Amino acid sequence: MMNRAYSLRNSRAPTASQLLNPPPPSSSTRSGRLFAPLSHTMRINHAATFTPDLAKRLAVLVKMEKNVMRSMEVTIRGRRDCARQLSYWGEDCDDDISDVTDKLGVLFYEMAELENYLIDRYDQYRMTLKSIRNIESSVQPSREKKQKLLDQIYALKHKDPESPRLVTMEQELVREEAACLVAEAQLSNTTREKFKQAMTFNLDALHEHAEKLNLIATYGRHLLNLIDDTPVTPGEARPAYDGYETSRQIVMDAEHALSSWVPSQPAVNFVKPQIEDDAQSDARSWNEYEAQGEPVPVEQVTHLQDDVQSDTSEIIENEPGMHPHVHAERMSRIASESSDAVPQQTAVQVA
C-alpha cells in the first residue's frame, strides 16, 4: 500500500497476492545493532570454524544470506530517507516540479516497503536452507563413528589378529554402516526436497518484487511526462501547471496495480522453438546472397520486419500494469519505426 499520507486509505488492506499467498512472519534477522560489517565477518568465520565438515559450506552460505538481509535493511532505511528528501527538495521548486517530486517520493517510498516485504520472503528461503544444514550436521557424527571403527579394526588386525574384540567391533561396524545408509538416504531425500522448496521461496519472492518494481517504474515514467521541459527565453513565463488531478490519478492507478497484482506461473519450454530454426535459415540465406553479391529479395525483408513488429506489438499489448498513455506512446513508436523501414526496403530492391 502507498504511504498513508497519499493513499486515500486509512488502514493497510491486504493485496491480492497476499490473499492468494499469505505473507510470512517477520524476518528473524531484523535488528538495529551497530558494527554490522564486523558482525558479518565474525558470523562467517564462526560457521567456517565450528561447523562439522559436511555442513560447513552450507552453513557459510546461510550466514552470508543473513548478511545480505542485514544489508537490505540498511538499503530500505536509505531509500525511505531519499524519498522524503526528494519531496522536501521539490517543495520550493515550480508547481510542476513540486507536484511530480512529491508523487515520485510516494512511489520511491513504496519501493522501500516492497523491499521490506522481500526481506520476510527471503528469510523463508534462508530458514529452509538451515534445515538442510541441520540434517547435514546430524549425519556427520555417524560418518565419523563409522570411520573411527574402521581405523580401530584395521589397527587391531595388525596388532592382534586373533583378538576376540574383532568380532564385537565388526558387528558394531555392521550396525553403524546400516545406520549410515539410512542417514545418507534421508540426507539425499531431504536435500532435494528442501532445496527445491527454498529456491521456490527465493525465486517467487524475486519474481514478485521485480514485477512490482516494473509497475512503479512504468507509472513513474508517466509522472515525468507531466513536466514541461520546453526551453523558454529569458523573461518568458511558462504555462500554468494543471496536472494535479492527473498526477493524483497516476498514483492511484499505481496503487491499484500493486494491490491487485497476482503471480502468474511462467511456462517453461525446454524444446527449441521452431522460429529460431527459421531465423537461422533466413540468416544463412541472407549470407548466401551477400557472398554472391546479389540483392536480398524485398519479400524476405518485409516478412522478417512484419514478424518482428507483430511479436513486439503482442509483447506490449500483454505487458501487465502498463498505463494507457505509455501503451499509446510505444505503439506509435513501433508504427514510426515501421514507416522508416520502407525506404530501406526500396534501396535493397534497387541494388
Swiss-Prot record:
Residues bearing PTM Phosphoserine: 11, 17, 39, 163
Region (Disordered): 1-33, 318-351
Composition bias, Polar residues: 8-20, 335-351
Domain of life: Eukaryota
GO BP field: eisosome assembly; endocytosis; endoplasmic reticulum-plasma membrane tethering
PTM description: Phosphorylated by ksg1 and ppk21. Phosphorylation is regulated by sphingolipid long chain bases (LCBs).
Biased composition (Basic and acidic residues): 320-332
A Pfam family recorded for this sequence: Pil1
GO molecular function, one term: lipid binding
InterPro entries noted in UniProt: AH/BAR_dom_sf (IPR027267), PIL1/LSP1 (IPR028245)
Record-linked Gene3D superfamilies: Arfaptin homology (AH) domain/BAR domain
GO cellular component, one term: plasma membrane
Keyword tags: Phosphoprotein
Positions of post-translational Phosphothreonine modification: 15, 230, 233
Function: Negative regulator of cell wall integrity (CWI) in unstressed cells, probably by inhibiting protein kinase ksg1/ppk21 activity and regulating their downstream CWI pathways pck2-MAP kinase pathway and protein kinase gad8 pathway. Activity may be regulated by the transient increase of sphingolipid long chain bases (LCBs) during heat stress.
Protein name: Probable sphingolipid long chain base-responsive protein pil1
The gene coding this protein: pil1
